[in-house]
């Protein structure tokens, strides 16, 4: 049985459906504190997925918490860990390019809120500087997308 390590800081009420998808696909989940990210395969600790619940959370991480987020990516790089940020959003955001057309809901109340084009540029720069990938999925597909990404990385690195 393949084991997925799930970070203990993942909130139980947010991951019920994800864990059901893991179980249905016959993956065992073990909760443990991870150095970086939220998910990894037990057999491949050098690839992690950092799950974000939506673009609003991702925007907060890379804008308001920019230094902390960069420090986490640098720590991963220093340890040889590849990070993939998986952002749960709607069907309108399927790629990094699509982020350009995102309309930040905070713009209604704050004209200085981050726009989609700006967020795209920040994510692209982080991708270049820290070799981080940004992937997107619908909320109902998160568990399956995590499995797909973990398996693909394992195959690319000769793990499976």
Question: Where are the language model's segments positioned?
Answer:
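Non-catalytic C-terminal interaction segments of nucleic acid-processing enzymes
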Residues: 1-44, 57-160
């Amino acid at each position: 049985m393949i084991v997925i390590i799930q970070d203990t800081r993942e909130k139980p009420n947010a991951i019920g459906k994800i864990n059901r998808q893991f179980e249905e696909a016959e993956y065992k989940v073990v909760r443990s504190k991870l150095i970086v990210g939220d998910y990894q395969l037990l057999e491949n600790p050098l690839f992690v997925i950092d799950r974000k619940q939506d673009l609003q959370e991702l925007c907060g991480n890379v804008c308001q918490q920019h230094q902390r987020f960069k420090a986490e990516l640098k720590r991963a790089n220093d340890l040889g860990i590849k990070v993939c940020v998986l952002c749960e959003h709607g069907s309108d955001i399927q790629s990094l390019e699509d982020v350009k057309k995102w309309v930040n809901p905070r713009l209604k109340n704050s004209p200085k809120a981050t726009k989609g084009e700006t967020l795209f540029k920040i994510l692209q720069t982080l991708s270049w500087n820290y070799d981080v990938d940004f992937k997107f999925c619908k909320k109902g597909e998160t568990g399956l997308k995590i499995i797909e990404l973990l398996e693909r990385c394992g195959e690319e690195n000769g793990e499976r």
